[in-house]
Amino acid sequence: MHPNMKMWIGWAACAFLLFACLGTLTEGYPTKPDNPGEDAPAEELAKYYSALRHYINLITRQRYGKRSSADTLISDLLIGETESHPQTRYEDHLVW
């Protein structure tokens, strides 16, 4: 085999593995519910809106814990407000 052909086989294998990994990541993401249409009965529309609300809550939920980066953690610890010393709403005090 030529060195150029080995390189192309290597790139093809890497691309295949990349697409396989991306495929497994998208399977974990929730799917959007199907719209029943404008002329659907009220019961189906209620089920659809309930499923849609659940879907939106899943994809927009806040994530805590290990997903926080060290930079934001340090800045929250240094600048964050506490119950005994809350931050003011205005950075500069008004001068009369």
Curated annotation (Swiss-Prot):
Protein's name in the database: Pro-neuropeptide Y
Single GO MF descriptor: neuropeptide Y receptor binding
Gene encoding the protein: npy
PANTHER family: NEUROPEPTIDE Y/PANCREATIC HORMONE/PEPTIDE YY, PRO-NEUROPEPTIDE Y
SMART domains membership: PAH
Keyword Transmembrane: no
Subcellular locations according to the entry: Secreted
Biological role stated in the UniProt entry: NPY is implicated in the control of feeding and in secretion of gonadotrophin-release hormone.
Principal location: secreted
Entry-annotated residues carrying Tyrosine amide: 64
